[in-house]
């Protein structure tokens, strides 16, 4: 079955035909490294990690290149260094490692060039300044960029298709602009390729304009990805991915400057939708903002974070809720029990592969997994079930036995399930005292117990206390 992917550029689902099946190439915009990755930052990493795994499964690990950058030169980084009194190098090195650790915790493979070179597949912007300067000089020579007051700007009117990716016209963009336009811009929508740096700001020798350097400065955000993608993947590559919030202006600007530099750039553009928390936009002002590390430190396993993310299709808004987290922990606990002692057969279920090949339909894949779980009886069933989980990036820490948080979370669910079972048994024997005592104990530990004619169900409330639960053993 052919992989089908929704292409933002054409606004339709298309058969994916790589330029070269022996060298499938994908670029995904990475983080600006000045702080911890919040939960929304994890969504594109997880989404495109699933695509990376699918491409590796389809074409072979040695035939897929996946590049994801780090932006380590940015005004936010400069501001963080100034307010903290620490060096930029120290901050970017620390936050880069934080990101790598947190994304590994949610099961993301490191990007790699044909399964051989991880470091080059995770380029830092500061390593590619020379390539950026060369591209800027080329754009100036071709009449697509101009120098003004120490800046170099891209002239959007020189590119007739500007706005095609996001479906915007230049006139509408100008009319809707609410920020003051710099007086040195020829057009309000022209964007910065290079900007001057003072003595307190990182800087490099700038592009040569009219036979001399424009002066010390630093690159604009958009030129970074174009230069790194071109250097590592070539003038034309297969897939470019990122969050929906990057479609404009970042990806729109990438396309404009790359095309005008003579590069066809990416054939397929993919965007994941944004994340909400309990139905609301995640923000510090609403008190619902948290990082991936916050969840991990609270004992939420990375496998659970990943599972919740994959339960919603990547092109739909993802709503993170406590209920979904609890349901994910219960499901993964049962699946872990099934696969204890299993060995990967390297034969994932074909139905799951078909779901993933249909524009990464992970919700359908998970619904099929629920059915396969119920049907699994033989060792071969369990081995194939584990193989399928591994294709989705789930179950690797179970097999390696290294994730303490996962084990603790599953032990918690196991204890609650055992206590619920004792309530059901006591009620069947009309031992109301034992039933009430156990239920009261669970309630005091923050576990809400509901008893109905259909049986006993439970969910963890906001006051859940693991220590009180442990005391009920």
From Swiss-Prot:
GO cellular component terms, semicolon-separated: cytosol
Predominant location category: cytoplasm
Cofactor remark from the record: Binds 1 zinc ion per subunit.
Reactions listed under catalytic activity: tRNA(Cys) + L-cysteine + ATP = L-cysteinyl-tRNA(Cys) + AMP + diphosphate
Entry binding sites for ATP: 284
A molecular function (GO) term: cysteine-tRNA ligase activity
Subunit structure: Monomer.
NCBIfam families assigned: cysS
PANTHER family referenced in this protein's UniProt entry, alphabetically: CYSTEINE--TRNA LIGASE, CYTOPLASMIC, CYSTEINYL-TRNA SYNTHETASE
Protein name: Cysteine--tRNA ligase
């Amino acid at each position: 079955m052919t992989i089908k992917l929704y292409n933002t550029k054409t606004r339709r689902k298309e058969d994916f035909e790589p330029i070269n099946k022996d060298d499938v190439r994908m670029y995904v915009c990475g983080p600006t490294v000045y702080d911890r990755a919040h939960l929304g930052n994890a969504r594109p990493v997880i989404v495109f990690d699933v695509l990376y795994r699918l491409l590796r499964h389809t074409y072979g690990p040695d035939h897929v290149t996946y590049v994801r950058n780090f932006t380590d030169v940015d005004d936010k980084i400069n501001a963080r260094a100034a307010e903290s009194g620490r060096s930029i190098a120290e901050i970017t090195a620390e936050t880069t490692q934080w990101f790598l650790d947190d994304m590994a915790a949610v099961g993301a493979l490191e990007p790699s060039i044909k399964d051989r070179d991880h470091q080059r597949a995770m380029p830092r912007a500061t390593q590619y300044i020379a390539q950026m300067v060369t591209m800027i000089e080329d754009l100036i020579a071709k009449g697509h960029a101009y120098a003004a007051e120490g800046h170099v700007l891209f002239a959007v009117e020189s590119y007739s298709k500007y706005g095609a990716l996001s479906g915007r016209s230049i006139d509408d963009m100008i009319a809707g602009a609410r920020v003051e336009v710099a007086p040195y811009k020829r057009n309000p929508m022209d964007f910065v390729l290079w900007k001057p740096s003072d003595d307190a700001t990182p800087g490099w020798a700038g592009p040569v304009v009219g036979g001399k350097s424009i002066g010390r400065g630093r690159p604009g955000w958009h030129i970074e990805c174009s230069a790194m993608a071109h250097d590592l993947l070539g003038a034309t590559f297969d897939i470019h991915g990122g969050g929906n919030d990057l479609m404009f202006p970042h990806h729109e600007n990438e396309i404009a400057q790359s095309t005008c530099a003579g590069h066809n750039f990416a054939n397929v553009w993919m965007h994941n939708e944004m994340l909400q928390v309990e139905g609301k936009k995640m923000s510090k002002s609403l008190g619902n903002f948290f990082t991936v590390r916050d969840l991990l430190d609270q004992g939420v396993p990375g496998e659970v974070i990943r599972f919740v993310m994959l339960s919603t299709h990547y092109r739909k808004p993802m709503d993170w809720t406590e209920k979904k987290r609890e349901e994910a922990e219960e499901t993964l606990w049962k699946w872990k029990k099934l696969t204890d002692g299993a060995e990967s057969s390297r034969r994932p279920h074909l139905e799951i592969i078909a779901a993933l090949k249909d524009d990464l339909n992970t919700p359908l894949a998970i619904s099929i997994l629920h059915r396969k779980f119920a049907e699994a009886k033989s060792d071969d069933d369990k081995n194939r079930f584990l193989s399928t989980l591994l294709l989705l990036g789930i179950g690797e820490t179970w097999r390696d036995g290294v994730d303490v948080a996962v084990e603790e979370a599953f032990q918690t669910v196991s204890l609650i399930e055992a206590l619920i079972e004792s309530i059901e048994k006591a009620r069947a024997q009309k031992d109301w005292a034992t039933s009430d005592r156990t239920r009261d104990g669970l309630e005091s530990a923050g576990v809400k117990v509901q008893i109905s004619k259909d049986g006993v169900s439970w969910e963890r409330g906001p006051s859940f206390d693991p220590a009180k639960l442990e005391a009920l053993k």
